[in-house]
């Protein structure tokens, strides 16, 4: 669970992938490029949350790499804390990453919760569209705990 797992957000495809380092971010982006290879124009709504101490800039560069016909938009969210049994794990504040995303000319917002970000993502009714939750296995855990019903 939590690795290249397809779900649905209403009628919108939703991909869960815990991609939490540069290598897994590159693998996720390559997978998405393959999935969208025959789609001339598509939107990816990213819902991302990161642990403190991660190489976020490298992960963002891998995930948000420009491609003709592909439009990115990002919601940054924290994951729930404390992480059960791991009090040393801390979520990076979403505001700590906004400038890095915006420096890549990508629309970026922050939300206080995964639920709020999913509501925002579901309101997007443009071209072919997918939603991807990534950046932390703890964020994927939040999805299963709070929103899978």
Regions found by a protein language model. Give the residues of each.
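Nucleotide phosphate-binding/pyrophosphate-handling subdomain across enzymes
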Residues: 1-72
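Surface-exposed, flexible loop/turn segments at secondary-structure boundaries
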Residues: 52-54, 82, 116, 139
